[in-house]
């Protein structure tokens, strides 16, 4: 009996009810390929996060008006800081329309690829895991890190990374100025 061997999974009820549904399998496979996910567990974690956000939004919509105003403002502010919504003044019903791609677009792996720091989504994952990527000077080694909106501009190569040194050396050899990214 005693303590459990491992903590509880974070994607409680994140697994689909019917694992062998061909439409679901194809959509999951497309998302895994498009966002460079390592396994379906990463997709289920994103779905679980989105499910909890939508659940909170439904609770707020069903709450009385005196409670609803402040709770709605807090939820929208949190989602805006996370980067999942583009404007705080959107109706709460549009929060219910969010899909899993909104969460997957905020992953560090996706943002590194979208910024052009990697040639492919898989290379972006490798750069992160090997410690070549930092956010505001702090190395982040988790490709699944959800980057808040205020830290998005701080994504860059780690200053001590060999990739930065190689690029600076290459620029100097070509006669250009050494520019630190």
Swiss-Prot record:
Function: One of the primary rRNA binding proteins, it binds directly to 16S rRNA where it nucleates assembly of the body of the 30S subunit. With S5 and S12 plays an important role in translational accuracy.
Name under which the protein is recorded: Small ribosomal subunit protein uS4
A GO molecular function held by the record: structural constituent of ribosome
Entries under SMART domains matching the protein: Ribosomal_S4 (SM01390), S4 (SM00363)
Matching InterPro entries: Ribosomal_uS4 (IPR022801), Ribosomal_uS4_arc (IPR022802), Ribosomal_uS4_CS (IPR018079), Ribosomal_uS4_euk/arc (IPR005710), Ribosomal_uS4_N (IPR001912), S4_RNA-bd (IPR002942), S4_RNA-bd_sf (IPR036986)
A GO CC annotation given for this chain: small ribosomal subunit
Family, per entry: Belongs to the universal ribosomal protein uS4 family.
Keyword list, A-Z: Ribonucleoprotein, Ribosomal protein, RNA-binding, rRNA-binding
Coiled-coil features, chain-numbered ranges: none
Biological process per Gene Ontology, one example term: translation
Record-linked HAMAP family: Ribosomal_uS4_A
Domain S4 RNA-binding: 106-168
Subunit structure: Part of the 30S ribosomal subunit. Contacts protein S5. The interaction surface between S4 and S5 is involved in control of translational fidelity.
């Amino acid at each position: 009996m005693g303590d459990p061997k491992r903590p509880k999974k974070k994607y409680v009820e994140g697994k689909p009810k019917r694992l062998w549904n061909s439409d679901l399998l194809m959509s999951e496979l497309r998302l895994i390929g498009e966002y460079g996910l390592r396994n379906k567990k990463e997709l289920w974690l994103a779905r679980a996060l989105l499910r909890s956000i939508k659940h909170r939004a439904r609770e707020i919509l069903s709450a009385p008006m005196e409670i609803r105003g402040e709770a709605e403002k807090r939820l929208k502010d949190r989602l805006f800081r996370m980067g999942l919504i583009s404007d705080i003044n959107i109706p709460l019903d549009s929060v219910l329309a969010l899909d899993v791609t909104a969460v997957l677009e905020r992953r560090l792996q996706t943002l590194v690829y979208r910024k052009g720091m990697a040639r492919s989504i898989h290379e972006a994952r490798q750069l992160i895991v090997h410690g070549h990527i930092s956010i505001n000077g702090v190395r982040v080694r988790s490709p699944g890190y959800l980057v808040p909106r205020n830290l998005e501009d701080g994504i860059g190569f780690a200053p001590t990374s060999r990739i930065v040194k190689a690029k600076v050396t290459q620029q100097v050899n070509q006669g250009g100025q050494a520019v630190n990214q």
